[in-house]
Amino acid sequence: SFTANCHNPEDFVISEIERGQLNFENEQIAAEYGAALKRQRIRRLNAMPWLKKIYIFIKAGFEHIIPEGLDHILFVLGLFFSSLKFRSLLIQVTAFTLAHSITLALAAIGLVKLQLSVVEPLIFLSIVWVALENTLFKQTTKWRPLVIFSFGLLHGLGFAALLTEYGLPKDSFISLLLAFNIGVELGQLAVLVIAFILVRAILINSKNKNKLKIPASIAIGSVGLFWFIESLI
């Protein structure tokens, strides 16, 4: 039987819940289940070869952007359409990457903590803000990198929420944190590359590239605003 094959009682309880044999009676049981599931994942990770763990966390970071992180995708696209000049885009993406890497690390070690219910609406507002700036200003403003850095701190907390839920084994903490962050960066890079290819395919004449900026930004901002309002209801 399954019970006999479980070396840890928590594994049996988790399995029974997932099979629908046990139900949540209150929030405490739900919280205990989540904690047990996290401990189970950590036990399984500890038993894996190091390279396999690295692969799993790079994959998890990438998938947190593509296909799961539509909010982060829209934010990165907002940066892309803010300036189709490589230098300006590079400065913004670097500021965003540096910022979210800082808060991701701080949150992972427990120095920074903010409820996801607070972080998510602010992330949605960051999408709206970037889209609004794209629409109102022809050129990127001088303070834009600082604003993007601030928003990156928020997005890092969003990344950390998933990582904290997933669990990090203590003996591989730093390497797996870096692996997850690498996956996130690869996801962002993939978004930018795909966007660049599509824009080049749609608008062969480089002089027409700015024609996409305002309509694309309005669409991005509208989705961000909808999500923000929805998160408050």
What are these regions (language model features)?
Residues 1-63:
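N-terminal soluble domains immediately following signal/targeting peptides that reside
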Residues 60, 64-233:
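Hydrophobic alpha-helical transmembrane segments in multi-pass membrane proteins
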